[in-house]
């Protein structure tokens, strides 16, 4: 199983975060996709940074990004391994300028996530992990292991969601 080194992917996430933050503190336009979700130059810029960097790092691994023209389902089903990317997760939060958005990069193998990274540019905090490496937080230049609690049978799941997606369906 291929597992990327954080030293290779952290700079990609941070560069995407820089592209986002360059737009965050200035006026920007908001477009709307077919599903009526917002799209900004920050989404597009972060997408380009990540897709180009992953293509250089792992040219044999396809990238499925929220902002790219998706391959057909038939093609995607043939992928045994791919990068799954949301270059700016929380565009509504970005637009409202509340700081609650992230850069998300995951490696999927045989339909299961094996490695993932979440970077919060406003907080300058990064979390990453995988089955083989555990879970880690990087903040203030320090990297520390964090604990992942296993779910105990019979206890309710704790789920975190965006305030902009709060509805009866998400409760």
Positions of predicted regions on the chain:
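N-terminal subdomain of lithium-sensitive/metallo-dependent phosphomonoesterases centered on the IMPase/IPPase/PAP
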Residues: 1-88, 164-170
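Residues embedded in well-ordered beta-strands
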Residues: 6, 10-13, 62, 82, ...
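Residue-level signal for inorganic ion chemistry
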Residues: 20, 43, 54, 91, ...
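Residues that scaffold the ATP/ADP-binding catalytic core of kinase and kinase-like folds
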Residues: 23, 93, 138
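Conserved protein kinase catalytic core
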Residues: 72-73, 92-95, 126
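Glycine-rich active-site/cofactor-binding loop and its immediate structural neighborhood
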Residues: 79-118
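Acidic beta-strand-loop-alpha-helix segment within the catalytic core
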Residues: 105-171
